[in-house]
């Protein structure tokens, strides 16, 4: 069972490793160089996070499993989300192992594996604040989103929708 789990993890990681194509090395190049350079983010628990100054989480566990079977070194670097995809697109890393919303713009630069996790997006308000109960009630309000997030790029779409609906 442990060996088959390792094989499954290896296959999943290898699929992810070559899912980003922008300036990323392919398998023969990685084998020749002897190292797969992987970027993960620093604050996306339970997938990627720091624990006492060390990488931790599900993705670290997957990379540890890959290290058992790969014929090359696996070098994990922890980056803030805001620079993660740019670092892969410029060739500093062979792949990113992280959660990312698939957008048309990102598809022009990256290849993605099939999803293996999903996340929901919510708007959050202060407890007891009854002024915000629908998306429409965001009209005229200041909103914040994560820097580098695909949701940031969708704010003009939200603004247009709110202007149209009043």
Where are these regions (language model features)?
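Extracytoplasmic small-molecule ligand-binding "clamshell" domains
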Residues: 25-99, 108
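Flexible hinge/capping segments at coil-to-helix
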Residues: 126-143
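Bacterial N-terminal signal peptides
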Residues: 9-17
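Sec/Tat signal peptide C-region and signal peptidase I cleavage site
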Residues: 18-24
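Bacterial N-terminal signal peptides that target proteins for export
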Residues: 1-9
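Short beta-strand-to-loop elements that line the ligand-binding cleft
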Residues: 73-80, 145, 163-166
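Secondary-structure junction motif
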Residues: 144-165
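Ligand-binding "clamshell"
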Residues: 104-117, 160-165
């Amino acid at each position: 069972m442990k060996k088959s789990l390792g094989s499954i993890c290896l296959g999943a990681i290898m699929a992810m490793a070559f899912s980003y194509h922008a300036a990323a090395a392919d398998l023969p190049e990685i084998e020749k160089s002897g190292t797969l350079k992987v970027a993960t983010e620093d604050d996306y628990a339970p997938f990627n996070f720091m624990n006492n100054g060390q990488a931790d989480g599900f993705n670290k566990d997957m990379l540890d499993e890959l290290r058992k079977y790969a014929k090359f070194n696996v070098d994990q670097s922890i980056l803030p989300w805001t620079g993660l995809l740019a670092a892969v697109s410029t060739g500093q890393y062979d792949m990113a192992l992280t959660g990312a919303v698939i957008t048309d713009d990102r598809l022009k630069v990256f290849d993605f594996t099939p999803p293996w996790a999903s996340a929901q997006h919510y708007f959050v308000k202060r407890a007891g604040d009854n002024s915000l109960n629908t998306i429409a009630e965001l009209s005229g309000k200041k909103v914040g989103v994560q820097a580098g997030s695909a949701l940031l790029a969708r704010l003009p779409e939200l603004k247009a929708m709110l202007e149209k609906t009043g």
